[in-house]
């Protein structure tokens, strides 16, 4: 099975900083979304490291940036053009679901994957949508 992760978990996966995350993924294929990937890149590009990298040492940030510039081929990111229509349907049908959440749910559906997010990205819209559609959804505290 594949696991779709948010930007917080992608950051931690690439940095190999979190044994609990490694255990939660447990050898499964990894995927993320275009929007979460872009949000992590934006944070890494800021001189201060942005919200996702605040407090990281310069060498840690450089290593993460290198991984973001050349994202490993084994991390799946479905092209937006494959997801856009489904995202539109999801947002139209599920009150409170954001575009970030819609892309995550659409990706999980497309890949027949689990969706695991940082507790920071958990919200009632994405949680309820996954429950309604039978998408396996979970959170990890960071």
Please give the residue ranges for each predicted region.
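Acidic, PIN/NYN-like endoribonuclease modules and their adjacent C-terminal/linker elements
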Residues: 32-33, 37, 105, 109-142
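Acidic catalytic patch
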Residues: 66-94, 102-107
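Phosphate- and divalent-cation-binding pockets in alpha/beta enzyme and binding domains
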Residues: 13, 39, 86, 125-126
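Short amphipathic alpha-helical interaction patches enriched in hydrophobic/aromatic residues
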Residues: 44, 48-52, 72, 91, ...
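Conserved glycosyltransferase catalytic-site signature
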Residues: 7, 101-102
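Short, well-structured N-terminal submotif of metal-dependent ribonuclease cores
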Residues: 1-39, 43-60
């Amino acid at each position: 099975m594949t696991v779709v992760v948010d930007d917080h978990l992608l950051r931690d996966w690439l940095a190999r900083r979190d044994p609990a995350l490694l255990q939660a993924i447990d050898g499964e294929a990894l995927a993320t979304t275009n929007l979460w990937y872009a949000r992590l890149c934006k944070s890494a590009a800021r001189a201060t490291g942005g919200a996702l990298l605040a407090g990281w040492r310069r060498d840690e940030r450089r290593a993460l940036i290198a991984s973001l510039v050349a994202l490993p081929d084994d991390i799946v990111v479905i092209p937006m053009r494959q997801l856009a229509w489904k995202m539109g349907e999801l947002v139209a049908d599920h009150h409170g679901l954001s575009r970030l959440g819609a892309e995550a749910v659409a990706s999980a559906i497309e890949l027949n994957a689990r969706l695991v997010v940082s507790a920071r990205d958990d919200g009632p819209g994405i949680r309820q949508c996954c429950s309604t559609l039978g998408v396996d959804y979970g959170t990890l505290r960071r």
